[in-house]
């Protein structure tokens, strides 16, 4: 079975990738390759950041690498925090500080104008081959206060109207069906099954 390296040290993300790909690949993460150089995500788009991570690591490791870049796009904030989602409140990255900043900026914005989406771009790179991309989105709105303890990042303030709960209140199984990353992963899996059959 071929190895697939997921370009992350985020255990939540890694679990999402493992769920979908363990039937096809031996899934590894950056924990298995501590020597890899840190890649600065300095792109202006999710596509640029995902490609940079996947292609740089694929060349370095000479292996199949999958990387993603994702973020929260809030309509009332003109699409912010966008590519800066992980570090929206500055360095070091801190989920609670990011949530606090978003809620502060949305103070006084009515519920119907708090629409937002999680957006994810996944890049799959292999040395000598063209990088494959997939996208996924999950629509929702930003709550006025955090609710729920599952998930990570902005999950406690991202309300999913179809389920009447925040991402942080949903079970892992439900989140894996709905999330932007799950949708991008499903799209990627369908693409690679067409390109690289078992």
Swiss-Prot record:
Listed EC numbers: 3.6.1.66
Keywords, alphabetical: Hydrolase, Magnesium, Metal-binding, Nucleotide metabolism, Nucleotide-binding
Cofactor: Mg(2+)
Reaction(s) the record says it catalyses: XTP + H2O = XMP + diphosphate + H(+); dITP + H2O = dIMP + diphosphate + H(+); ITP + H2O = IMP + diphosphate + H(+)
GO molecular function, one term: ITP diphosphatase activity
Binding-site residues, Mg(2+): 69
A GO cellular component entry from the record: cytosol
Recorded family membership: Belongs to the HAM1 NTPase family.
Job description of the protein: Pyrophosphatase that catalyzes the hydrolysis of nucleoside triphosphates to their monophosphate derivatives, with a high preference for the non-canonical purine nucleotides XTP (xanthosine triphosphate), dITP (deoxyinosine triphosphate) and ITP. Seems to function as a house-cleaning enzyme that removes non-canonical purine nucleotides from the nucleotide pool, thus preventing their incorporation into DNA/RNA and avoiding chromosomal lesions.
Protein name per its UniProtKB record: dITP/XTP pyrophosphatase
Lineage of the organism: Bacteria, Bacillati, Bacillota, Bacilli, Bacillales
């Amino acid at each position: 079975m071929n190895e697939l390296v997921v370009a992350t040290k985020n255990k939540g993300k890694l679990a999402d990738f493992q769920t979908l790909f363990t039937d096809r690949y031996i899934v590894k993460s950056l924990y298995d390759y501590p020597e890899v150089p840190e890649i600065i995500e300095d792109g202006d788009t999710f596509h640029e950041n995902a490609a940079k991570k996947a292609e740089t690591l694929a060349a370095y490791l000479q292996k199949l690498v999958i990387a993603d870049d994702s973020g929260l796009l809030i309509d009332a904030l003109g699409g912010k925090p966008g590519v800066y989602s992980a570090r929206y409140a500055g360095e070091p990255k801190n989920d609670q500080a990011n949530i606090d900043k978003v809620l502060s900026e949305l103070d006084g914005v009515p519920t119907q104008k708090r629409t937002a989406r999680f957006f994810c771009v996944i890049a799959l790179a292999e040395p000598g081959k063209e990088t494959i991309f997939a996208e996924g989105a999950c629509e929702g709105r930003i709550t006025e206060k955090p609710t729920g303890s599952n998930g990570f990042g902005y999950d406690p303030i991202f309300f999913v109207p179809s389920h009447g709960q925040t991402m942080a209140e949903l079970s892992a199984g439900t989140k894996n069906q709905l999330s932007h990353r799950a949708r991008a992963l499903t799209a990627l899996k369908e693409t690679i099954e067409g390109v690289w059959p078992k």
